[in-house]
Amino acid sequence: MLQPKRTKFRKVHKGRNRGIAGGTEVSFGSFGLKAIGRGRLTARQIEAARRAMSRAVKRQGKIWIRVFPDKPITEKPLEVRMGKGKGNVEYWVALIQPGKVLYEMDGVSEEVARNAFALAAAKLPFKTTFVTKTVM
């Protein structure tokens, strides 16, 4: 599972997920999976989608993960009264804005890449689209 090795602070405020995304172009591979929706992507979802893609391409080609879960999410245990401080860190998320390229792939045909990204998209909590590298 992906998570930071060290952080400056153990817990962070909830914050808001507004604004426009960086990393909107396919820069490493030939094909990419781009987010259309906005949301939080957990480390487990990132890993599940990666596994689905790598199985679909039968371990050929190369896959790049363009997102990293760097925000800790805390939860209080069941049946605990309110108050008494912030809960414990339970999992890590990456905040995703529309237009962000989540995964990239190279070394496979477009048909195989489309199929692999379709399997990966089923594991994600927002809508995505298939994109190709634009050559200037």
Swiss-Prot record:
GO terms for cellular component: cytosolic large ribosomal subunit. Keywords: Ribonucleoprotein, Ribosomal protein, RNA-binding, rRNA-binding, tRNA-binding. It comes from the Bacteria. PROSITE patterns: RIBOSOMAL_L16_1, RIBOSOMAL_L16_2. The keyword DNA-binding does not apply. Coiled coil: none annotated. GO terms for biological process: translation. GO terms for molecular function: rRNA binding; structural constituent of ribosome; tRNA binding. InterPro entries: Ribosomal_uL16 (IPR047873), Ribosomal_uL16_bact-type (IPR000114), Ribosomal_uL16_CS (IPR020798), Ribosomal_uL16_dom (IPR016180), Ribosomal_uL16_sf (IPR036920). CDD domains: Ribosomal_L16_L10e. HAMAP family: Ribosomal_uL16. Part of the 50S ribosomal subunit. Belongs to the universal ribosomal protein uL16 family. Binds 23S rRNA and is also seen to make contacts with the A and possibly P site tRNAs. This is Large ribosomal subunit protein uL16. The gene is rplP.
